[in-house]
Amino acid sequence: MLGFGSMFMDISSELVHSLLPIFMVSVLGASMVTVGVIEGIAEATAAITKVFSGAISDYFRKRKPLVVLGYGLGAITKPVFPLATAIGWVFAARFVDRIGKGIRGAPRDALVADLVPREMRGAAYGLRQALDSVGAFIGPLLAVAFMAWLANDIKAVLWVAVVPAFIAVALLVVAVREPEPAARESGSRCGLTLADAKRLSLRYWLVVGLGGVFTLARFSEAFLVLRALDVGLPLGLVPTIMIVMNVVYAAFAYPAGVVADRIHQRALLVVGLGVLIAADVVLTVATSSALVFIGAGLWGLHMAITQGLLSKLVADAAPDELRGTAFGMFNLVSGGALLVASVIAGGLWSAFGPSATFGAGAGFAAVAAVGLLLYRPRPWDGEHDANT
């Protein structure tokens, strides 16, 4: 049920996200730099919040209350978007919404690890990603349908997102049960301290660094939506870009998670980076909506390969009692990298056009792939699993 709650929130969030970049640029008059800054700050806020929510969930050994609080904040922001008359309203709503995401993110990921055996974690994270992506497919699909029904009235369509958001909160409150603390791990409680950080292995910090470089190469999906508008896709059909991306993501997330439990994970990460490079190259040269659709599909495939795998690597590299903290630190670094990446993406778009934005993304991905190929684990890295 945790996955279904996440799915309903993704229906709501992705309906909003598939239209929000257009709303900011076309209705509220925001520049590309402004879009990049808002998206970057929003995601960085989520990441910073994840550090503390993860540590708190480790300290109190309670994940569910934080997960419910986070989803609740996400739900109450949804009516603000259609009410917005200035870009500041959107920024404030995104800020609070991402605080909610930050509060729920690390405890939710840690709760998944608490509920499943170690050997099934890759599949479990892949299943959660797949359900997220089903919701992320339905959200933009609803956006397209209601844009057609409501004559491209973006504000009216944004009201639709309110309903699934509150369904998600209700599901989590009623149907999700977490194991008792003693069932997870006995021992002293832990908070976010320097001593805790020292207990995290070099293997874990290498995963954190890898996640940061990955994120530099993968800026906000808002720029995919704006790329579709840039090549001339009709306004009411622009959300179909997110549909294509999320269909591919949903189709491949669970199989990729299962594969991650069975083969060399570094090789799988390199494959994921190669797919991201291909997506960026296609989006760099795109002159038609067909090419943007291909690029969006490749983008979704890259996410399916890498996102659940990175979560598995974090879970496997961290002690059980510090798992929430470990996910929080990982998300902090990734969120900071996303802020930098989105600001750079917006600046390049404004100065040189969309091709520069996606070309830079391909460059960052290539650097990450080369670094991953050159890395050789050492005995003191804590990397004993043959698959890692």
Residue ranges and their predicted role:
Residues 162-184, 368-376:
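C-terminal membrane-cytosol helix-exit motif in multi-pass small-molecule transporters
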Residues 1-46, 204-241:
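Helix-loop boundary and gating motifs at the non-cytosolic
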Residues 93-134:
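Cytoplasmic helix-loop-helix junction between adjacent transmembrane helices
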